[in-house]
Amino acid sequence: SGKEADVFVVRCGSEIRCAKVYKEAMKRSFKQAVTYQEGRKVRNSRRNRAMEKGSKYGRKQTEEIWQNAEVDALYKLAGAGVRVPTPYGCIDGVLLMELICDADGDVAPRLGDVTMSAEQAVEDHRLVMLYVVRMLCVGIVHGDLSEFNVLLDEQGPVIIDLPQAVNAAANNQAESMLSRDVNNMTNYYGQFAPELLGTRYAKEIWELYEAGKLDPDIELTGKFHEDEHSADVNAVLTEISAAIQEEEARLERMKPDEL
């Protein structure tokens, strides 16, 4: 069980798979869900307004989007070369997917439940940083990455739990979420390989992303040099003012046809 779902091992014909049963919003302990949903596109304007108002219909739509976000992310990340469970579909709040197993055929342990050598920690950390980069290359930040959301099978780390995954280009908190994800993983692996604790992968990755230089197979260094140039305060204030005016105009447009 987790903070947003209960997970079961189930039989599907001759196959053993994993069924993730999402909890209702009021029963989830996942904090600040609205922050994670920022930037998720909803093309239907009526649906979007209902979600913003929090009506019964709107809450139902929000739940569907929350659940479908994980399925969409799993397919997208698998295609990008990130190791994730294979999804088989999501119906009525139940996500059916591949069961990740260890070398003995048992359910693979969470990363937080294993110990490892310094050499293995460095190698697995390198792989996880590679997966973070590949996620970002397709516009996704995990948003809740830690040793509790990574499984370890005989081939290495497998990333799980993605309903809160955010759109890197559309979510204002994407950089801070990526930084937290990277630092969580670095601090964990740093218990076994202390040399990792002095690295600055989060800053390096985000700078490359913003510069349009991030590549799925890029060789990271873990180093980052701060820009010592002064910020253009007037430009920042102008952008803030424009954003406020845009939001006020949006709210004004909504008034005549509220649900």
Regions found by a protein language model. Give the residues of each.
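Regulatory N- and C-terminal appendages and interdomain linkers associated
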Residues: 1, 119, 127, 134-138, ...
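Conserved ATP-binding subdomain of kinase catalytic cores across diverse folds
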Residues: 1-107, 137
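Catalytic activation segment of kinase domains across protein kinase-like and atypical kinase folds
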Residues: 13-24, 30, 101, 107-114, ...
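Amphipathic alpha-helical transducer elements in NTP-driven molecular machines
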Residues: 64-71, 122-125, 175, 179-182
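Catalytic-loop of the protein kinase fold
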Residues: 84, 137-147, 152
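A glycine-rich phosphate-binding loop feature that marks nucleotide/adenosyl-phosphate handling sites
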Residues: 93-95, 149-152, 202-208
